[in-house]
Every structure is written in C-alpha cells, then in structure tokens.
Amino acid sequence: MQQTPLFKNHYFHQLPGFYTALQPTPLHGARLLYHSEGLASELGLSSDWFTPEQDDVWSGTRLLPGMEPLAQVYSGHQFGSWAGQLGDGRGILLGEQQLADGRSMDWHLKGAGLTPYSRMGDGRAVLRSAIREFLASEAMHHLGIPTTRALTIVTSQHPVQREQEEKGAMLLRVAESHVRFGHFEHFYYRREPEKVRQLVEYVIARHWPQWENDERRYELWFGDVVERTARLITHWQAVGFSHGVMNTDNMSILGLTIDYGPYGFLDAYQPDFICNHSDHRGRYAFDNQPAVGLWNLHRLGQALSGLMDTDTLERALARYEPALMQHYGTLMRAKLGLFTASPDDNDVLVGLLRLMQKEGSDYTRTFRLLADSEKQASRSPLRDEFIDRAAFDSWFATYRQRLMQEDQDDEERRRLMNATNPKYILRNYLAQMAIERAESDDTSALARLHQALCRPFDEQPDSHDLAALPPDWGKHLEISCSS
C-alpha cells in the first residue's frame, strides 16, 4: 500500500522574512527519468512513487499534503569578493519530510523556475547538470563523505539555452538543511542583526538542540561548525575530490558537500588541479581547498560578530587547523594501511605523493594497488606503475619498515585498506558518457555507473571497465559553472 510521506515546513513558519513563498513553474513534457532506490528506501518511499502516475510530484506540479514551497534568500562571497544577493535563483524548498526516526529532511527542487532571487538567470537547470549532481551526491554518500543527497531526476521537452540549447531538467535534492554560510551573511550585510540572531537560534534549535538552553550556545555551535567544515574538507582531500566553486553561498552550515557544479575527482595526482575552467587564478584549486575553507569560516565569523566578541570568535576559528590536521592524518594513515600513529608517518605519505606527482600517477588506482604490497616482500606490485623504479624502491623500503610496526597481517591490512581506498570514483569521462546516453533517453549507462558508485570499495568483477583510467579524450574535459 502506498503511504504518503508526512511533511511540515519549519523554515516557512519560524523564519518569516527569510524567503518568498511561491510555486514551482512547470516544465513542458516533464517526466521522471531516474531515481535513487537506496535513498527512496531510507525515506520510506515504495516503488509506487516512481511510476509515470507520480511524475507531477517529482516535477513540483502536484504538492503533497504539508508542503509549503518557498525560495530562500541568501548572499555570499564569490571568488573572494562580496557579491551581494545570490539566490536561491532556481531552487524551491518544497517542505520537510518527517521521518519515522524523528529526523526531518528538506525536499528541495532544483530547476523549479524563476524566483525573486534569480537575478539574470532563467530559473532552470539542464539535464547534464542534474545528472552530474545526482551521480556526485550518490558517489560521495557511499564514500562516507557528508553530502546532500539526490532522489530524482526529471527530464523534459523544455529547451534551455546555455552555451548551446539543452534539455531542461529538475533535481530533487534531499538534506537535513539547506542553510548556508551565505544566509547569515545576507542579513549581516543588510544590517539586520536581529535576523542573524534569529537564524542562529533556529539552526541551533533544529540541529544542535543539546545546546539550545546553554549560555555559551553560540560559541559551542560556531566551534562545531568550524570543526565540521574542517572534517568535510579533509574527506575531500583524502579521496581526491575538488569542489570547484567554494563560494560562501556554497558552504553548508551542517558541514555537508553542497552544490555540485564543475567538480572533479583527481585522475593523475596533481595538487594544483583546477576542475573549474572559469577559475582562472586557481583560487579553488585542489590543494587550496583547506585554506579556502578557513577563509570562508572567517567570513561567517564576521557575519556572527554581533553575537560574539572577537576573542570568542577567534577561539572557535582556532579549532580549524588542529581538527584539519588530526582528521587528515587519520584518514591518510588509513589509506597507507597504518592504524597507529608514528612521528615519521607524514614523511612516508609525502614521499609517496611526491613520487605520484612527479610521474602523474593515478591517485585512486595507486592507493588501491598499494594494499597488495606485503610486509615481507622486497618488491610491491605497485612498482610496475612507476617509471623511476629506483625511486619507488627507496620509498617502498621505508614504507615496509613502517608496516613492520603494525599488528595486522597482510590479509587483514589489505581488507582494511580496501575498505578505505575506493576502486570506483566518479571520473568525469564516465559521467559524460552516461549523460550523452541519457540525453537520448537511454538510462542504462547511468544506472550501471550509479550502481557501481553505490559500492565503491567492492571489487565488482562485472564493472572493472568503470575503474579504468580515462582515455585520452577524457583526461582534460573542461567543466564550467554553466548548469
């Protein structure tokens, strides 16, 4: 029996003046193209919800009981400069689904049409960008990285003009909250300190209720936001993920990865990798992400300066670097198969990364193959991946000595490393092939890639081709902010 999900909209009722209430604008010929069965199950939605009879739900044409759609207003810094009001220019928060375990989840429809905050945009999304966000959301979730999720992709016959004409689409994004750093900045720069305070109180009550009545709640909360952001970015660095557009309006207050645009996972290890071809100065290059994260937190701290004094803000911000280093060290040791800490661990890691950078070694493949090394063997199967084998042998001798300090035998260490180092990541060329097929209404490549990304650490013998290195045409795909 099909059970209708229960909705409320706390944001609608508790934060008047923070949004505009409005309905989604229909897309011509809209229909459900694809959905996440795993997320649907987590949300308690049966397969009956994903039949053609329900297309009007996923396109926002038919609202479910309790939905009260609205467009949130927020501002932000783009590429280091204050940009003023930025959105939400094409996304509508439909409502908050109330789950059986007591949590609530935003249903946010991206590409839902013009809002009062659209500026020069058309309020639409294209199928290409919807598929890229869907796949990235699923990939990151199954890699264990905090992220928004994506439930459905809707395609249409509605033409949308970008660099060329493309199919209009909608994506239903699911998250515990869509509040961004830019929400707080918006009211700070409008000189509305009471609204900043109101938003902070709302967020604490909804997501940090343990501190709701604590006199130090602002400091405790902001310190936790700082640490969540640090941990998120260490996850990105460890898995080789480059976000591409770390503007303050693209930073989640919950420490989730949000707004997948011109992102990319590292192929060859290239610390200064720039995935966004609009980022001409490399502000959001892969190796600059930790520094940008802290810069963005300083902008958030500035927006909160009416609630906390300078010493309190600086105390909270000072938690960033220790959290970053501690968490990054833990994640990277695990990638190396080191489960205790030693003073020399950073030298072992840096030695391998330098070799990889020098030779352009594939980031994901190198760490995955490293698990097949044995303590007692003088050579590693990974050796054949390097041209300068003498340099690799020198590094491997140091690595073997470090492995001797670990308690795990080779089989146990291999198992633990393979549960940390994925075999399957979302390479841009794989996404592009799935997009091209889906634009012709063939979702078979999308489904196959999605299924592999849901089990990134498993061998999956039938999917080995999806772990292949990019072909020449797929090595330098240019991805822009256009979506």
UniProtKB/Swiss-Prot annotation:
It is an enzyme of class 2 (transferase). The active site is at 249 (proton acceptor). InterPro entries: SelO. It comes from the Bacteria. GO terms for molecular function: AMPylase activity; ATP binding; magnesium ion binding. Signal peptide: none annotated. Mg(2+) binds at residues 250, 259. It catalyses: L-seryl-[protein] + ATP = 3-O-(5'-adenylyl)-L-seryl-[protein] + diphosphate; L-threonyl-[protein] + ATP = 3-O-(5'-adenylyl)-L-threonyl-[protein] + diphosphate; L-tyrosyl-[protein] + ATP = O-(5'-adenylyl)-L-tyrosyl-[protein] + diphosphate; L-histidyl-[protein] + UTP = N(tele)-(5'-uridylyl)-L-histidyl-[protein] + diphosphate. Its EC number is 2.7.7.-, 2.7.7.108. Keywords: ATP-binding, Magnesium, Manganese, Metal-binding, Nucleotide-binding, Nucleotidyltransferase, Transferase. Its cofactor is Mg(2+); Mn(2+). Coiled coil: none annotated. ATP binds at residues 87, 89-90, 110, 122-123, 173, 180, 259. PANTHER family: PROTEIN ADENYLYLTRANSFERASE SELO, MITOCHONDRIAL (PTHR32057:SF14). Belongs to the SELO family. Nucleotidyltransferase involved in the post-translational modification of proteins. It can catalyze the addition of adenosine monophosphate (AMP) or uridine monophosphate (UMP) to a protein, resulting in modifications known as AMPylation and UMPylation. This is Protein nucleotidyltransferase YdiU. It comes from Pectobacterium atrosepticum (strain SCRI 1043 / ATCC BAA-672).
